[in-house]
Amino acid sequence: MQLSPERCRPMSENREAWSANSEEMELLHGSNRLSSPEHVRRRVSGNSSEDGSPRICRQQSFGRDIGHAAAETYLITRLSFNLLGYLGVGYRWITRLLALACYAMLLMPGFLQVAYLYFFSSQVRRSIVYGGHPRNRLDLYIPPTSDGLKPVVVFVTGGAWIIGYKAWGSLLGLQLAERDIIVACLDYRNFPQGTISDMVSDAAQGISFVCNNISAFGGDPNRIYLMGQSAGAHISSCALFEQAIKESRGESISWSVSQIKAYFGLSGGYNLFNLVEHFHNRGLYRSIFLSIMEGEESFKQFSPEVRLKDLNVRKAAALLPHIILFHGSADYSIPPEASKTFTDALQAAEVKAELVMYKGKTHTDLFLQDPLRGGKDELFDHIVSMIHADDSDALRNDAVAPPRKRLVPEFLLKLAGRVSPF
C-alpha cells in the first residue's frame, strides 16, 4: 500500500496495510509491527509462565533482533559505499576517510554500548513504517513510565544528505526517553536514492505520521517538538517552511505547523548559496552538491533563510513556531555564521527566534562527544528545560535526575576531537 505524501490515516485503519511493503522494507522492518506501548509492556511482562513457553518466545525475539542487527549493519555498509562512490577518489576525501575511521575507533566503546541498547532495549521500537517509499521508517524511544501523555521530539538526523540514518539519533533518543520524553527518529531517502525534494517530502510525511498517531504510544499530540541536526536541520526546516506555506495558501494538509510547539535546529545550514563553496573546499564537491540539491536553480526553494526575504511568504512566516538554533563557535563543517544569519532573517520577519552559541564547540562536540562524556551537558539540559517549561513536576524531577553515565573515557574523547574530520 502506498501512502499519499499529503495524507496519513489514523493508525487503526492502516495497521495491517503497513506490513505489506517491499522486500527491502520487510528485511529491515522484520516482524516489528506497529504496536502500542501497552502491547510492548504486555509482551515484556509475559516472559514468565509455568509451561516454559517464554523461553521459546525469548529465543525467537533474540533471533529476530540478531537478524535485524545484521540487516541494519548491511544498510550502514551500503551507505558507506554510496558515499565512497559519489565522492570519488580525491585527497580531501581520502584524508577525511582516514580521519573518520580513527574517530570512530576512538569512540567505539560508547558506540557499542549505545548499539546494544538500540537493538535490545524494550524501550526502542525500531523501523516503524510511516510511508510507502524505501527508507520511510522511524524509530520510537519510549520512556520507562506510562503515567500521562508525554511530550514528543521528532528528530531528523544529519549525514551530509548522503549517509543520514535514523539510528544516528539513538543516543539522543535514549537519553531524552530517560527524561520522560518520547523521541521519534526519522529515516529518509538519501542521495542517490533521492534528492532534496524527496528528503523534504519524506520528513514532512514522517512528521505527519507522528502528529496523527503518537497518542497511541502515549505521546501528547499537543506537545510535539521538531529537531534536526546538520543536514537534518536543513531538511526539517525546509519541511516546516513548506508546510507553513501550504497552510497559508489554504491547501489540504495532513498536519499543521501549529502542532509544533518549537523547532530546534542544531548545527544546521539554511542558505545553500552560502554553503556550496564551503562544502566544495571540505570535500563535498560542487557537482555532487548540485546533484543533491537539484541544481542551483533550486537553491532558493530549499534555502529557508532566502525565502524569508520573499514578501509572498511573509504570511507563512507568521505561522512558524518558536525557533531556537544551536551552534558551536568552532564548527568547521557548517560555519556558525549559518545559524546567525538565519536567526537575523527570522527576527527581521518577526518570527520568534533565538540563537544559542556554544563557545569552542565543534560540529560533533554538541551531538556526540558531549553526550558520550556523560554528566552535565548544556545543550541537553537546555532542550529538556524548554520541553518541560510548563510542567512543574517534570522540572522537579529533572532537578534531581542522576547524572548521565560516562560512555567513553576522557582521553579517548580528547583524541577523537583532535582527529575528527567534521
Curated annotation (Swiss-Prot):
The chain crosses the membrane at residues 97-117, 152-172. This is Probable isoprenylcysteine alpha-carbonyl methylesterase ICMEL2. It comes from Arabidopsis thaliana (Mouse-ear cress). One of its GO terms (molecular function) is prenylcysteine methylesterase activity. It catalyses: [protein]-C-terminal S-[(2E,6E)-farnesyl]-L-cysteine methyl ester + H2O = [protein]-C-terminal S-[(2E,6E)-farnesyl]-L-cysteine + methanol + H(+). Residues 1-16 have a biased composition (Basic and acidic residues). PANTHER family: AB HYDROLASE SUPERFAMILY PROTEIN C4A8.06C, KYNURENINE FORMAMIDASE. It comes from the Eukaryota. Catalyzes the demethylation of isoprenylcysteine methylesters. May act as a negative regulator of ABA signaling. Substrate binds at G158, G159, A160, Q229, S230, A231. Belongs to the AB hydrolase superfamily. Isoprenylcysteine methylesterase family. It is found in: Endoplasmic reticulum membrane; Golgi apparatus membrane. GO terms for cellular component: endoplasmic reticulum membrane; Golgi membrane. GO terms for biological process: response to abscisic acid. Coiled coil: none annotated.
